[in-house]
Structures are given as C-alpha cells and as structure tokens.
Amino acid sequence: MNWPFAKKCSILAKLAGIFMYRKIALAIAFSPRMEALIAETKRLVGVFDAELLLIHVGEKTDELEEKLDLILEAHALKGPKTSVLWKEGKPAKRIIQTCEEEQVDLLVLGALKKEGLLTYYIGSVARKVIRKIKCSVLTLIEPQLSTTQFCQVVINGTQLDETPHVIAESLKFCRTLGATQLHILNDIPLYGLQMATAGEGSGDEIALTRRKLVQEEINYVQGILEGLDQSELKVNIKVTAGKWAVELVRYCETIQADLLIMGDQRGYTFIDRLFPHDLEEILAELPCNLLIVK
C-alpha cells in the first residue's frame, strides 16, 4: 500500500474540513478474504483518520482470536483506535444493532460478485444489512491485500429526493480517496411515453423533443454540481433512456468502473423483491464495488 499517498490524502481531507467518517466498521467472517478486507479497511481508516471497529458475529474461540490478532499485528492495527467486538445471534440483526449502538458512520462488507436465484429471494446477510442499516455501506466484491484504487467511479444521478446529497457526498469521497474520473449517470423518466407522444409530430419535432429531454437531465445534474468542490475531478454527465438498473450496470461494465455510488432506497417487502427495484436488481448482480450513501 502507498502509505505516503494515504497520509497525503488524510492531510488534504483535514485541511478541507472533510470528516466524512469518524468511525468505520468492518464485518468479518473467518474466510480466505478476511485479511484483504482488513487491508482495504485500513486504507480507509488512514485516509479518513477514523476509528476502526471490527465486528464478528459467531463463536469466539482462542484460536480465532489469535488468528485475528496476528493479522491485526501484521497490518499495524493493534492500537487505541482499533477495537474488536464479538457478537452472537443472527448476523444481519447483530451487525445493524452494533453499528447503531457504536455510532458507526461507514460499514464495510465483503460480497460475492454473483448470487444465486434462491439467495436473491430469501435475501443474503449483506443485502439485509444494506437495506436496513442507518449508516453508509461500502460493499467490496474483490478486496485486495494491495488495496483497491477507485479511479473510475459511477454515481447515480437519477432525479430522486436524495440525489443532491448523494452527489455531494460522492464528490467528497472521491476527492479524499484520489479518484480522478467521475461519471454521473442520469435517466430520462417516462422516456418511452414522452417519445411516443412526440412521435405524432414530424421527424424534426421528435429530434427536438429528444434533445430537450436530454438537456433537462443534464441541467438537473449541473444545477446540483454548482457550488460543490470539483477540484482535481473530471466529471462526465451521461444520460440514458433504457431500463435504468440495466443501463447502470451495463455502463459500469463498459467503462470497467471500480466503484458505483447510489443513494438509499428503503421499505422493501417480500413482494417488492419478487418485482425488483433498481437497488435490488443491482444487488443481485453487482457490476463493481458499491457504496450506498445514507
């Protein structure tokens, strides 16, 4: 890991008054990817000058405790700003409860890149946590010991109540972590219906309607960006007109995005999951790492 880079980012964050995350938690299972997740979280803790909380839901044994201690020592994480909590019970419920009690600002999770159909309908631990937890959640699909650099970042810019907050927080996050290229993706609501109505006119009228719809979405995002610090960031606004979740995943795959940032969408029932919302569709097949801003 490039610690001079992390230190520089931390100093810049402090000078800019950006204290996004005071406490960062990592939910750990004793899997082969645990050390990589710890390494990734260490980078975030260093960059944001945050406290680290490790949460394990399951049996605590001398063997597991020793294994974790060795990893923490290897990564220089044994200190007053690191704490470990061992919990028992249902993983999702205990993780959510612990993060609330400990006033966690960001939770880091590991996730499989693809999940099976049965898991999708029942709901995995990670998905339950993402839906119900009150803090922001960063889900890493391929954590690395060398840590992941977020270079190509895609942000959901669709017109929702939380979008201005999501974009503002995304810019802070990306500037602090040294991301360079941001793509804000926005879709045209009811595009098919609007174009069908315009289809009654001439070819020029149809083209004019299409350009107007696209420009309205660009203006919406530009209005949010005004007044936000975009220094050292290259921001690209992209407007789509297809099924939003599909287009978002496709765009992430096309540009080989390192990170997708979205806002929170709450209130799902089992029936809702049978007819997926945008977030559910993306959680079913993550195109890249995912940050849910809350």
Regions found by a protein language model. Name each.
Residues 15-65, 79, 152-205, 227-230, ...:
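Small/aliphatic-rich secondary-structure junction motif
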